[in-house]
Regions:
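Residue-level recognition of tetratricopeptide repeat
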Residues: 34, 68-69
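Acceptor-substrate binding/catalytic loop of class I
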Residues: 237-252
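A short glycine-rich, Lys/Arg-flanked "PGG" loop and its adjoining helix->strand segment in the class I
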Residues: 211-226
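A conserved beta-strand element that flanks and buttresses the S-adenosyl-L-methionine
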Residues: 199-200
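Conserved alpha-helical positions within TPR/SEL1-like repeat arrays
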Residues: 2-13, 36-43
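Class I SAM-dependent methyltransferase SAM/SAH-binding core
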Residues: 142-187
């Protein structure tokens, strides 16, 4: 069964979707209660536009795996069969970053594939104008890929993340003063008027509505403090769940939210964040200043 799934994934990556479909169907014939086989078959059907069949597969995946580590409910939301959740479900996110943590540092070395950290670095350095060392929060710090960039500027450097696997990697580099395994909203609600700069690299892609998290970030910043962050760009709606199950937001949405909270946009740059299955993922990098 595993061999058929591996073959199906290889064929899918090669664009041989009909052959991949046959391979996943064979896996299901051999083991009908294998959630990953139904999920992968659903992705094939979704890709070729057989949405009703895709829905059946994702519903079956949920039936077999109620914890939904694979993200079947999010797939159903992209097909209009579920309400888009306010945030990336924790079970899915933990599984996602558990896999990512094993090769994240290698991915970030491949700047032809992943450029998110470089874009944040440029935004931070372009707008940093404080001669003294500052208090920095690396929000959703992951494995700590930005720590070596931020450390020379930091009086204190704090990292917060929800993934234990990512935080273990961040601990190994010994560049943070403190690391916390906490929900970001919970952590922010516990600190007020504390940070000179808050960094959120590929973090807001896990939040559908940004009103509350922006309010908490503003409250956690000192006056004239800066918020450096990236979003995946959405061009059709104000906010959306994209095809690879992350949230995207429009420039108008961010601008309106910043205006409402009296956060001044001092930097904005559109660029390619990364490549997902050979497709470019457009992003916007911002720096907002608390007035």
């Amino acid at each position: 069964t595993e061999a058929h799934i591996n073959l199906g994934n290889t064929l899918k990556d090669q664009g041989k979707l009909k052959e991949a479909e046959a391979s996943f169907r064979k896996a299901i014939t051999l083991k009908p209660d294998l959630a990953i086989a139904h999920y992968n078959l659903g992705k094939i059907y979704k890709k070729i536009g057989k949405n009703s069949k895709a829905v059946e597969c994702f519903e079956k995946t949920l039936e077999l795996n109620s914890e939904d580590l694979l993200g079947a409910a999010l797939q159903l939301a992209t097909l209009g069969k579920r309400k888009i959740p306010d945030r990336t479900p924790e079970n899915f996110m933990q599984g996602f970053y558990k896999k990512k943590s094993k090769h994240w540092s290698n991915l970030e070395k491949k700047t032809h594939k992943y450029r998110g950290h470089l874009l944040i670095e440029n935004a931070f350095k372009t707008t940093h104008n404080n001669s003294e060392k500052i208090d920095i929060l690396d929000m959703g710090c992951g494995t700590g890929s930005l720590a070596k960039i931020l450390r020379p500027y930091a009086r204190t450097l704090v990292g917060v993340d929800l993934s234990s696997d990512m935080l273990l990697k961040a601990e190994e580099i010994c560049l943070y003063d403190s690391l916390y395994k906490k929900d970001l909203s919970q952590y922010l609600s516990e600190v007020s008027n504390h940070y000179d700069t808050i960094i959120a690299a590929a973090v807001l892609i896990h939040f559908y509505d940004l009103d509350n998290i922006f309010f908490l970030i503003k409250d956690s910043l000192k006056i004239n403090g800066k918020f450096v962050f990236s979003i995946f760009e959405e061009t059709q709606k104000s906010k959306n769940l994209n095809s690879f199950l992350m949230y995207a937001h429009s420039d108008d949405y961010i601008t309106t939210l910043a205006d409402r909270l009296n956060l001044k946009i001092i930097y904005k740059q559109k660029d390619i964040h990364e490549y997902h299955k050979m497709n470019s993922v457009p992003a916007i990098i911002y720096v907002l200043e608390k007035k």
